């Protein structure tokens, strides 16, 4: 007989896997899919925390039917209104017209806009409580992690924190729902960084504030139940919490990301010389990304991870190579902080790339290393020394 996964005797995992979609938010590649997590608590009153993408509502409702056996859903707590979590709300209300919807003021503004629902609402603020029998929920507002209406929900008897998108990750779940069953833990944490960089990274100060509020409440947490990815158990959650503490505080590892575009291989040769110079100077973590081939989400993951960033571009139509410009914009809008930066370029007849790359450090309020250099055509011997020296300068600054 099919068994719906359980976190405790009365708390069920009713999320679904999406292995069909190629890009999360129609932007970020998800080769291993993604999970849309929702949770059902059964007590004197039944309470659902979030829903799933409407494309998977049939699977979601089937799970609810198996558990409820004809009982209604009494409450829906909305931690996050984004359609991958709130997409089935309208259908859910049609099924359970007497269901009370729990959220904050901003939740209800969005609920009206996305679903036209304006009745049967139960508004909560930080510190408010809702009892459904032996279970009691309290609420903690977490605005801009990563939408303005986001809130966390804490269930006291089982010590569960339902954390919306915080502590989530890309990747569908393969049978097990708990982090204790992860067979490739570091790979999963790498995916968490990629998810954070792409989806939440712009809002680091708000993440940091939400983490501080969790600590201020003194919550005793046994399980953390995010909207994507595994459910964290107490011991394993230290990994996820530590990762979020570091990322939201702009803490980085000693290492360098080299981003380059190259039409005919000349700029790529310069990137390789820089990497070799860094290695010779003792830098252990060096990542080179050809921006026309590397996945942008993987590039962002590495930019969030390492302190050093070197960008190289050929001149193209008197401007930057457009894939480089696109990546710079992704970095710009995430307001990545506290990096050590260097630049280099190439051209055939009219130099332009380097003078457009140099101001990026000042714009982002980063520390710039060196003046950079620029290769004309394929005259590699004329700049090989400058490339090597720039790598050495970057290494020295990282180790200072």
Regions found by a protein language model. Give the residues of each.
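Metallo-beta-lactamase
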Residues: 5-9, 102-150, 206-209
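Conserved beta-strand hairpin/beta-sheet module of binuclear metal-dependent hydrolase folds
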Residues: 5-64, 152-155, 159-163, 267
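Active-site metal-binding motif and surrounding structural segment of the metallo-beta-lactamase
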Residues: 44, 55-102
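Active-site neighborhood of phospho(di)ester-bond hydrolases with catalytic His/Asp-centered motifs
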Residues: 49-51, 73-81, 101-105, 161-164, ...
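Short acidic active-site motifs
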Residues: 88, 294-299
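Active-site-proximal loop/helix segment associated with metal-binding centers of metalloenzymes
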Residues: 146-150, 158, 166-201, 247-251
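FMN-binding flavodoxin-like domain, especially the glycine-rich phosphate-binding loop
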Residues: 173, 183-224, 229-231, 273-287, ...
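Terminal amphipathic helices with adjacent charged low-complexity linkers/tails
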Residues: 226-253
């Amino acid at each position: 007989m099919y068994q719906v996964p359980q976190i405790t005797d009365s708390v069920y995992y009713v999320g679904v896997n999406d292995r069909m979609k190629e890009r999360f938010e129609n932007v970020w590649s998800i080769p291993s899919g993604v999970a849309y997590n929702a949770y059902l608590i059964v007590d004197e009153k039944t309470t659902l925390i979030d829903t799933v993408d409407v494309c998977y509502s049939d699977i979601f409702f089937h799970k609810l039917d198996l558990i409820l056996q004809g009982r209604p859903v009494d409450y829906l707590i909305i931690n996050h209104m984004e359609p991958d979590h709130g997409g089935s709300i309208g259908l859910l209300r049609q099924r359970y017209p007497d269901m009370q919807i729990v959220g904050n003021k901003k939740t209800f503004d969005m609920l009206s806009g996305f679903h036209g629902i304006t009745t049967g609402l139960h508004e909560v603020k930080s510190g408010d409580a809702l009892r459904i029998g032996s279970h009691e929920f309290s609420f903690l507002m977490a605005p801009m992690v990563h939408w303005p209406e986001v809130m966390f929900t804490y269930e006291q008897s089982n010590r569960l924190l339902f954390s919306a998108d915080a502590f989530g990750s890309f990747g569908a779940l393969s049978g097990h729902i708990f982090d204790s069953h992860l067979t490739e833990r570091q790979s999963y944490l790498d995916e968490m960084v990629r998810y954070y960089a792409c989806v939440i990274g712009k809002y680091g100060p708000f993440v940091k504030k939400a983490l501080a509020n969790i600590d201020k409440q003194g919550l005793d947490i046994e399980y953390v139940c995010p909207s994507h990815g595994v459910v964290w158990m107490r011991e394993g959650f230290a990994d996820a919490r530590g990762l979020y503490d570091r990322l939201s505080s702009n803490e980085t590892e000693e290492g360098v990301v080299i981003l380059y575009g190259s039409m005919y291989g000349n700029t790529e040769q310069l990137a390789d010389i820089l990497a070799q110079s860094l290695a010779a100077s003792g830098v252990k973590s060096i990542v080179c990304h050809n921006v026309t081939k590397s996945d942008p989400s993987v590039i962002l993951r590495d930019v969030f991870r390492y302190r050093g960033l070197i960008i190289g571009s050929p001149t193209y139509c008197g401007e930057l190579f457009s894939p480089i410009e696109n990546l710079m914009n992704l970095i710009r809008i995430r307001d990545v902080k506290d990096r050590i930066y260097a630049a280099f370029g190439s051209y055939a007849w009219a130099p332009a790339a380097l003078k457009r790359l140099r101001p990026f450090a000042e714009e982002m309020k980063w520390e710039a290393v060196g003046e950079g250099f620029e290769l004309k055509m394929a005259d590699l011997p004329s700049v090989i020394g400058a490339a090597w020296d720039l790598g050495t300068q970057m290494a020295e600054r990282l180790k200072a």
